[in-house]
Swiss-Prot record:
GO terms for molecular function: alkanal monooxygenase (FMN-linked) activity. GO terms for cellular component: cytosol. Light-emitting reaction in luminous bacteria. The specific role of the beta subunit is unknown, but it is absolutely required for bioluminescence activity. This is Alkanal monooxygenase beta chain. The gene is luxB.
């Protein structure tokens, strides 16, 4: 089991843009000295539910601040970006960091963004797949020469070529059954979302297994990752109230067709929120449901920076104990 962090960079009545960005930098430098494997940064546009619209740019900055930890995008939305530009940036970051960059990518979850970036909603899945093929060709071979319904141009060299043989490690966010099935055929590991229920994550994991088996994908090589929100406090009610305030606007935006109160309670119950027993129990169950080999933690629901660091230290101590026991 490997452990990393992810940053959502939400802003609200208690956190302004500058504070969110400064905290991300400070926590990144702090955990670089610890035993965490990686840090991934969330992409969002046009709302307060994430102030980073360019996670590759932020990744480059954070890679420059650090020495050993891997850093990358959590959900770079390839459907609304030019695939060659993504490949160029990814290869450049892979070179500059000498292999510490990770490309987590995603389909677009918001129809408004598809319209804003002038992308055809009716062909969204096809566009996503074609974008990936261009990016993958560039990362694995250094070249691409697409001829499809969306992109067609002569063979080009994508410079610089990747530092890592085969390109940087890639993950795709599990945003739908279509994406999960597509990823399983390709053998691309998933990132399970923190706001999906355990039942949904279980369903995605089982569907991935079934499709991967059909296409002879070696599941032992697949290292799915699971996002978990963390707010540990022996005053369980305080932890839950803080987390509720942190995620409320996001739930309203991203889950408009679900009962607001029920969805909030579900997320709080199925992430590591509350006292020690509640946090451990919820995290273990979530991991068991989806079979993830890596866990990505966000401590952002905790308002106090020192409290975040204290809980990070607790997790780090457990990582050290885990490695001592199993290595």
């Amino acid at each position: 089991m490997k452990f990393g962090l992810f940053f959502l960079n939400f802003i609200n009545s208690t956190t302004v843009q500058e504070q969110s960005i400064v905290r991300m930098q400070e926590i990144t430098e702090y955990v670089d000295k610890l035993n965490f494997e990686q840090i991934l940064v969330y992409e969002n546009h046009f709302s307060d539910n994430g102030v980073v619209g360019a996670p590759l740019t932020v990744s480059g900055f954070l890679l420059g601040l650090t020495e050993k930890i891997k850093i990358g995008s959590l959900n770079h939305i390839i459907t609304t970006h030019h695939p060659v530009a993504i490949a160029e940036e990814a290869c450049l970051l892979d070179q500059l960091s000498e292999g510490r960059f990770i490309l987590g990518f995603s389909d677009c979850e918001k129809k408004d963004e598809m319209h804003f970036f002038n992308r055809p909603v009716e062909y969204q899945q096809q566009l996503f797949e074609e974008c990936y093929e261009i990016i993958n060709d560039a990362l694995t071979t250094g070249y691409c020469n697409p001829d499809n319904d969306f992109y067609s141009f002569p063979k080009i060299s994508v410079n610089p070529h990747a530092y890592t043989p085969g390109g940087p490690r890639k993950y795709v966010t599990a945003t739908s059954h279509h994406i999960v099935e597509w990823a399983a055929k390709k053998g691309i590991p998933l990132i399970f979302k923190w706001d999906d229920s355990n039942d949904v994550r279980y369903e995605y994991a089982e569907r991935y297994k079934a499709v991967a088996d059909k296409y002879d994908v070696d599941l032992s090589e697949i290292d799915h990752q699971l996002m978990i929100l963390v707010n540990y406090n022996e005053d369980s009610n305080k932890a839950k109230q803080e987390t509720r305030a942190f995620i409320s606007d996001y739930v309203l935006e991203m889950h408009p067709n679900e009962n607001f109160e029920n969805k909030l309670e579900e997320i709080i119950a199925e992430n590591a929120v509350g006292n020690y027993t509640e946090c451990i129990t919820a995290a273990k169950l979530a991991i068991e449901k989806c079979g993830a080999k890596s866990v990505l933690l966000s401590f952002e629901p905790m308002n106090d920076l020192m409290s975040q660091k204290n809980v990070i230290n607790i997790v780090d101590d457990n990582i050290k104990k885990y490695h001592m026991e199993y290595t």
